[in-house]
């Protein structure tokens, strides 16, 4: 999207508590150890200290001197110096580009529209950032079509059924491998609820990221796979590009009072090794460094 030496990376999770923020923080820390100049923003607000459903602590973003952040005016904390102002507004005020003058925790409330995100990224790179990280979500996934790399997170908090998790990863590989199609006036925004009338026809979809909005990834996958078996063809004008899938064995376990943190004793990397998209558990060994190399386009 931008120049060769400027990389934008989006992160989203298929559910809450699947390690999206942990993956982003791991990438951030490893990129910093490689000497990269970093910028960070969020599609929407990300600043709660406690998960409003489970009551468990949420990972926090701590940035260092020289890092850049795009956040709303009311989220600015001491130690941030505004270097550029955008024309993007949120309920928490204008989105500002700021540079850290001391190490501090940051609260993010960034642009949530594609054009507004593009403005923030352009400003980041004009201020010298080499890698811009974007904390996104499945509910607001469309702006992430803008980024150069897309990291998708899933895990036991999404489903404790290993067979279902495998099928979902299989579905993600399927969606990401659909052939690129030429622009067409008949391109579909979303998958029809009833695909039978299209039997034997070519189905062209406009945006690959929209597959992730399906309430039933497996059902959608099986429906499209059946369409191929019935002689139809599939294509995507703007394909779904997933650079890596991060996985987490963490899940919030119901307790007497709310929830408590728990982990399933399973090697998800091994269980999902069939995936052509790299599957990474950033909590395991050196896999955080491996994910950072994928972000930079130098590993897999």
Regions found by a protein language model. Name each.
Residues 113, 117-274:
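Conserved catalytic-core segment of NTP-binding enzymes
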Residues 18-19:
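Conserved glycine(s) of the Walker
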Residues 1-3:
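Pre-Walker A adenine-sensing motif
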Residues 38-43, 109-110, 131-136, 152, ...:
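General beta-strand structural signal in soluble alpha/beta enzymes
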Residues 243, 274-300:
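A cross-taxonomic marker for long C-terminal extensions/tails that follow the last structured domain
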Residues 23:
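Hydrophobic positions on the alpha1 helix immediately C-terminal to the Walker A/P-loop
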Residues 8-15:
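Short hydrophobic/aromatic beta-strand immediately N-terminal to the Walker A/P-loop
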Residues 27-99, 299:
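N-terminal phosphate/diphosphate-binding loop that engages ATP/GTP or pyrophosphate donors
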